[in-house]
Design a protein with these regions (language model features):
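Canonical Rossmann dinucleotide-binding motif of NAD(H)/NADP(H)-dependent dehydrogenases/reductases
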Residues: 2-34
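Substrate-binding pocket helix/loop in short-chain dehydrogenase/reductase
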Residues: 96-109, 202, 206
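Catalytic loop of short-chain dehydrogenase/reductase
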Residues: 136-159, 164-165, 169-172, 185
């Protein structure tokens, strides 16, 4: 185990979506890091900032129960503790409820509900044992309101959000905070592809539906997440916050 006074943060997937940006923000705040499948060049970039990084490969699929367990084991072996942990997972299934299939349901539940379940089951017991810790689960703003054309996805995300609230209530007395933040209308490839927003006309219509009139960036989203995982604010738990430009 490394002898260090730095906090230790675990990012479940550092190759995708907000993962690399979260890792950068945490490194700037002098956190040592445990990263699942970090993006190419990211480890060198972060170690240049003076932090230690433990990369864990082959764990991107958090719906696999072993993925989160491997991340936690790596953190405990290298650093002896986990002060904060963040994870994003999901499988987007679109279409009307009446047109959906059981296969669609199983897919979205596995990606959006089982994955955060496995992550929480792996991370939270360590923090309970420590008597301290912060967990942030990324769900979706569609968990907060009905979403036309994404009923199964919205429903599964709502389930994950309520799971976070229940876990938070269960472990609050152990000094552990568990919160959820849900995005929508984000300027990153998966959303652009799923929504058709690579087409400028479609993007303009989508942006018009956002009260702030634009798409969000992963960099600003990572900054928003920091108080939930950087140890500076520990009086919030069991909350869901939509990060969607005022849409939810």
């Amino acid at each position: 185990m490394s002898e260090t006074a730095k906090r230790v943060a675990l990012v479940g997937d550092a190759s995708f979506y907000v993962g690399p940006s979260l890792a950068r923000e945490l490194a700037r705040r002098e956190h040592n890091l445990v990263l699942g499948d970090p993006a190419e060049g990211l480890v060198d970039e972060l170690t240049a900032l003076g932090v230690e990084v433990e990369a864990v490969l082959g764990v991107r699929n958090l719906a696999d129960p072993e993925s989160a367990q491997k991340l936690v084991a790596a953190a405990r072996t290298r650093f002896g503790r986990i002060d904060s942990a963040a994870a994003f997972s999901g499988r987007v299934v679109t279409g009307k409820f009446l047109d959906s299939t059981l296969e669609d349901l199983h897919s979205v539940v596995q990606g959006c509900l089982e994955a955060p379940y496995h992550f929480l089951k792996a991370v939270v017991p360590v923090m309970v044992e420590q008597g301290d810790g912060q967990v942030l689960v990324m769900t979706s703003a569609t968990a907060a309101r009905p979403s036309r054309g994404a009923s199964l996805y919205s429903s599964a995300r709502a389930g994950a959000t309520m799971m976070v609230k229940n876990v938070a209530a269960e472990v609050a007395r152990n000094g552990v905070q568990v919160n959820a933040v849900g995005t929508n209308f984000m300027d990153f490839p998966e959303f652009l592809r799923a929504s058709g927003a690579n087409d400028p006309e479609i993007r303009a219509r989508i942006e018009a539906a956002v009260p702030l009139g634009r798409l969000g960036t992963v960099e600003e989203f990572a900054s928003f997440c920091m108080p939930f995982i950087d140890g500076t604010s520990k009086f919030t738990t069991g909350q869901f916050i939509a990060y969607a430009g005022g849409w939810a």
